[in-house]
Amino acid sequence: MSIVTKSIVNADAEARYLSPGELDRIKAFVTGGAARLRIAETLTGSRETIVKQAGDRLFQKRPDIVSPGGNAYGEEMTATCLRDMDYYLRLVTYGVVSGDVTPIEEIGLVGVREMYRSLGTPIEAVAQSVREMKEVASGLMSSDDAAEASAYFDFVIGKMS
């Protein structure tokens, strides 16, 4: 839920107008909209590059996952790993656009640790894949945009750690 929706829901629940503090938060949200959209456009437009480069970096740092017996061993399992990385990048994009981590958590992180544990997938490798995407994506943006996007990547990483 965006800051705008949250503020309206809270004010309406109390049958009141928006407070000056709520209006200030909404103003900051609206003012930052162009930057959030620019970041989302960069992530969306560069998603194949981000996922591929981050995947290559992950597999260099964690050769165990692409070796025989590893969770990403073989063409099909490597493709599955890259698909999952793309999914988390998409979630980060949702967070950036909304200016909130709620969509990330509600759409895709509930039960993620348990799911990977049940599949025998090392969750630390999944978290590392998100770190690698953060690094690659940050190199495609200004330092201000990278700092904004980093908060959402870090949220995903934190939920996996």
From Swiss-Prot:
Chain positions with N4-methylasparagine modification: 71
Topological type in the membrane: Peripheral membrane protein
Protein residues bound to (2R,3E)-phycocyanobilin: 81
Biological role: Light-harvesting photosynthetic bile pigment-protein from the phycobiliprotein complex. Allophycocyanin has a maximum absorption at approximately 650 nanometers.
Protein origin, superkingdom: Bacteria
Family membership noted in the UniProt record: Belongs to the phycobiliprotein family.
Gene name, Swiss-Prot/TrEMBL: apcA
A Gene Ontology cellular-component term: plasma membrane-derived thylakoid membrane
Disulfide bonds: none
Gene Ontology annotations of biological process type: photosynthesis
Quaternary structure note: Heterodimer of an alpha and a beta chain.
Keywords from the UniProt entry: Antenna complex, Bile pigment, Chromophore, Electron transport, Membrane, Methylation, Photosynthesis, Phycobilisome, Thylakoid, Transport
Record-given protein name: Allophycocyanin alpha chain
Keyword field contains rRNA-binding: no
Organism name: Synechocystis sp. (strain ATCC 27184 / PCC 6803 / Kazusa)
Post-translational modification: Contains one covalently linked phycocyanobilin chromophore.
One Pfam family named in its UniProt record: Phycobilisome
PANTHER family: ALLOPHYCOCYANIN ALPHA CHAIN, PHYCOBILISOME 32.1 KDA LINKER POLYPEPTIDE, PHYCOCYANIN-ASSOCIATED, ROD 2-RELATED
Extent of the signal sequence: none
Subcellular location: Cellular thylakoid membrane
Entry annotated with the keyword 4Fe-4S: no
